[in-house]
From Swiss-Prot:
Classification via SUPFAM superfamilies: Bifunctional inhibitor/lipid-transfer protein/seed storage 2S albumin
Primary site of residence: secreted
Disulfide bonding pattern of the chain: C32-C70, C42-C59, C60-C85, C72-C92
Subcellular location per the Swiss-Prot or TrEMBL entry: Secreted
Name by which UniProt lists this protein: Tapetum-specific protein A9
Tissue: Tapetum of anthers.
Keyword field: Disulfide bond, Secreted, Signal
GO cellular component terms listed in the entry, alphabetical order: extracellular region
Signal peptide residues on this chain, from the entry's feature table: 1-29
Gene name, Swiss-Prot/TrEMBL: A9
Amino acid sequence: MEFLKSFTTILFVMFLAMSALETVPMVRAQQCLDNLSNMQVCAPLVLPGAVNPAPNSNCCIALQATNKDCICNALRAATTFTTTCNLPSLDCGITI
C-alpha cells in the first residue's frame, strides 16, 4: 500500500518535472509532456486502495507509446526536488 502511495506521488512529480525541464528542446519537452499526460489512464491503478492494481489494456498501450527516456528523465528530476524544496528524500524502494 505504501508503494502505491509513493508511486502516485512519483507520477505527480513526473508531470511537474516535465514542465520544469529547461535543457530539453521545446519540441522534445512537449512530446514528453504529452506522453506522460497520456499515462494518466494508469493513475487509478496506482492510487492507494486500488481494487485491481494490475495494468489494463489502456494503461499498457499508454506505457508502450511513452518514450522511456521521458519516464526516466522525469523520475531522475523528481528525485532532486526534495533537496531543492528542503524535504526528506524519496525512499520508494526503486533504483533508477
